[in-house]
């Protein structure tokens, strides 16, 4: 079967990137259909970008492009495989990244299986800003062409088999080009702002939302010198490097420099803060990562020189990675790095290629 006869199911989110992805695939001659995923049941009535509005936008785009739109409900899978783990991590005092888990369990597992088995798809496609390259019979994950929008950080858990079944049409474009195409086609999503917030749950007041599922446990805020200067409403609401929302100003005798979260003592429910965004207690010389996943290669043995990101949109950090065992590695940065956060992902690169990554188990502090 020629590529042009192959069937692609595009994950239609109701946003501009998936809208333009569907159009580009039609232009390339594929047989294109859309799929809208509903992954969250509860509606709190807030006037945020609701699933109903997104579905209406996705339907309007599909109507305009002349393609069929299917819908599917993955709420049970989302709850069991993403949200419960998300809550467990917060309960343990870590800061998880639900988007990474969501891509792993929903968009490139539940969606991929449903598209292939129920809809007869040869490929799925999404509006992610990444590229793929097929090298020696394996599909590699590459950064998106638009450095500002590159989303490979969120897709490091994909296998080369999953990437081989996936197409990323906007990964070859820059965001302004994508918006321009949508405007020229007069798509309803052309000027729609990019979604933020928790994957599939949307833009909510995070503290209120989390408080519904996890009871808040107020505790002390201590300085690095052990001085008590305030009360926090729950460690889960705070992450390393955080400045806003601490509710503390300068101390009477001290400077007026802003306070930053530098550590969390989960056992004693204490939030530890220091003044200055580059305080030594906030800096790390490396990290230990676990739950490793390598996209298209065997588990690391020995050492590797590469770059790493410990959060999205961070500048690449040159580092040396050493295998501790099959599922744990030690990463040493060339220069100290601020706000390395347990629970987040460390993602590794060689040039344009995303090698894989793991969950940050602990940071190796510059100063303890």
UniProtKB/Swiss-Prot annotation:
EC code(s) of this entry: 2.8.1.13
Source domain of life: Bacteria
UniProt keywords, alphabetically: ATP-binding, Cytoplasm, Disulfide bond, Nucleotide-binding, RNA-binding, Transferase, tRNA processing, tRNA-binding
UniProt function note: Catalyzes the 2-thiolation of uridine at the wobble position (U34) of tRNA(Lys), tRNA(Glu) and tRNA(Gln), leading to the formation of s(2)U34, the first step of tRNA-mnm(5)s(2)U34 synthesis. Sulfur is provided by IscS, via a sulfur-relay system. Binds ATP and its substrate tRNAs.
InterPro entries: MnmA-like (IPR004506), MnmA-like_C (IPR046885), MnmA-like_central (IPR046884), MnmA-like_central_sf (IPR023382), Rossmann-like_a/b/a_fold (IPR014729)
Cellular compartments annotated: Cytoplasm
Site (Interaction with tRNA): 128, 344
Cysteines engaged in disulfide bonds, as pairs: 102-199
Record: active site: 102 (nucleophile), 199 (cysteine persulfide intermediate)
UniProt record similarity statement: Belongs to the MnmA/TRMU family.
Gene3D superfamilies xref list: Adenine nucleotide alpha hydrolases-like domains, HUPs, Translation factors
Subunit structure, as described in the record: Interacts with TusE.
Annotated protein name in UniProt: tRNA-specific 2-thiouridylase MnmA
A GO BP entry: tRNA wobble position uridine thiolation
Species annotation: Klebsiella pneumoniae (strain 342)
